[in-house]
Regions:
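Flexible glycine/proline-rich, aromatic-decorated loop/lid segments
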Residues: 189-205, 414
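Acidic/histidine-rich catalytic neighborhood of metal-dependent amide-processing enzymes
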Residues: 120-193, 455
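A short core secondary-structure module
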Residues: 217-239
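Active-site metal-coordination/substrate-binding segment of hydrolases
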Residues: 78-145, 439
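N-terminal helical capping/dimerization or prosegment-like subdomains
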Residues: 1-95, 319, 336
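Acidic, glycine-rich active-site loops and adjacent beta-strand->loop/helix elements
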Residues: 87-89, 147-155, 178-182, 206-208, ...
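An extended, acidic, His-containing surface patch that forms the Zn2+-binding/catalytic region
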Residues: 184-185, 242-319, 330-343, 348, ...
Length: 455
């Protein structure tokens, strides 16, 4: 057993308790009532970096929530690894569906249940504890920098300003991110890419006020009905997206790439059982793994209007709203897709309503070459601790800052995520397996070792 593994074994209970303390802070970036919690969480992250051995741990204020920067420069001749993560979390709603308090971390059957357990507190904190292991055992072989932001869940609106203003500070040789998932602990994998994102809100307005549905119903267009029809028109009978030009820039995956994806373990019955669905859905001609990894999508994230309170209220609403996200694949542009979606909804609106639409945020897709020494270092690290080679896969989610880092810092990005698709990210009862948390802490130092050797 090497020195850092011995240190982990001796301190793993403390590592876990420190993570639970961090999870108790309700750092919800989307809600202004949590602004004080965001500040408290940033301070906690900075302190954890200092305690782990960082020479610098600074909180940078932004127009929104703070960014925490940390670094340890061991030797200027060593390669430098920039670790990115985020301490903000999604809103916990609906609270009534949680089995325990979202900010009262609870351990059940070896799993941590709490908002942010996997996304991303549990995952970025692995790097903090790996840093502590390496500093305390004199095992540092790279310089390490940290950028832990507080606005990832709302589109990172202030990160670009920070990155562009601090290019010298952020100079590195690679960016390492743990904010993705594996197939399973028995079948380790590495995300070699993430999809881009276009997030849009649609507002449909009919009459100038809510109306009595008995007096006006049948004579005035109902915005909810109109919006529902417009949304339904976005897919055809093959579940193909109908928006003109949506697929124009999509580069079809090669037969060999699709064959490689088909080798990844996937149990369709288990997939359906886990989700409680009778059957799957999706674009005709593609497998479930392809639909969630290499194909673009359009999903309705929310739709509302009229009266949704307790009891009954017979109104014909003035307005209806929907929030829509599109996941994008390499060569698609979030700006282009956003414009196409906005124009489409306006073009198909009947003349008895008006439609307004606007963009919330977006990001570009990203791919890591599997023949790069950055990827190979991660693959070797995972093979060392898991005892088998990881499978390269495409992630279905989005990390909008990837293209920013690549463009501004000129660095390749490696995704080393230890979550699982079943971890209920963005949903009630988010979880993170303790064994995954520990395995990540064990694996990360090997990445630094192998990356330094390759450099």
């Amino acid at each position: 057993m090497n020195a850092w593994k011995e240190f982990q074994e001796a301190n793993k209970d403390r590592f876990l308790q420190e993570l639970l303390d961090l999870l108790r802070i309700p750092s919800v970036s989307a809600k202004s009532e949590h602004n004080d919690d965001m500040q408290a969480c940033a301070k906690a992250v900075a302190k954890s970096l200092t305690d782990a051995g960082a020479q610098i741990a600074t909180i940078y204020e932004t127009e929104g929530h703070p960014i925490v920067y940390g670094e340890i420069i061991v030797d200027p001749s060593f390669p430098t690894v920039l670790v990115y993560g985020h301490y903000d979390v999604q809103p916990a709603d609906p609270l009534e569906l949680w089995h325990s308090g979202p900010f009262e971390p609870t351990i059940i059957d070896g799993k941590i249940f709490a908002r942010g357990a996997c996304d991303d507190k549990g995952q970025f904190y692995m790097h903090v504890k790996a840093l502590e292991m390496m500093t305390k055992t004199n095992s540092m072989c790279t310089n390490i920098k940290f950028v832990i932001e507080g606005e990832e869940e709302i589109g990172s609106p202030n990160l670009a300003t920070f990155v562009k203003a601090n290019k010298d500070l952020l100079k590195a040789d690679v960016i390492l991110i743990s904010d993705t998932a594996m197939i399973s602990m028995d079948n380790p994998s590495i995300d070699i890419g993430v999809r881009g994102l276009s997030y849009i809100e649609i507002e449909v307005t009919g009459p100038n006020r809510d109306l009595h549905s008995g007096v006006y119903g049948g004579a005035v267009a109902n915005p909810i009905t109109i919006l529902s029809k417009m949304i339904a028109a976005c897919h055809d009978e093959n579940n193909h997206i109908t928006i003109p030009g949506f697929y124009d820039d999509v580069i079809e995956s090669t037969a060999s790439e699709r064959a490689k994806m088909a080798e990844a373990p996937f149990d369709l019955n288990e997939f359906k059982q886990d989700l409680g669905i009778a059957n799957i859905w999706g674009e005709k001609g593609y497998s479930t793994n392809e639909r969630t990894g290499i194909r673009p999508t359009l999903e309705v994230n929310g739709i509302w209007g009229g009266y949704t309170g307790e009891g009954a209220k017979t109104v014909l609403p003035s307005k209806a709203f929907a929030k829509i996200s599109c996941r994008l694949v390499p060569n698609q542009s979030s700006t282009v897709i956003t414009e196409k979606v906005l124009n489409y909804f306006k073009s198909i609106a009947p003349d008895n309503v008006t439609v307004s639409a606007f963009e919330h945020h977006g990001g570009e897709p990203y791919i890591t070459p599997i023949d790069s020494h950055e990827y190979q270092s991660a693959a070797k690290a995972i093979a060392t601790t898991f005892g088998k080679e990881p499978i390269p896969v495409r992630g279905g989610g989005s990390i909008p800052i990837c293209s920013l880092f690549e463009q501004e810092l000129g660095l390749k990005i490696v995704f080393m995520g230890f979550g699982l698709d079943s971890d209920n990210l963005h949903s009630p009862n988010e979880k993170y397996d303790i064994v995954n948390f520990y395995k990540g802490i064990e694996t990360i130092p090997y990445f630094h070792q192998f990356f330094a050797e390759k450099k």
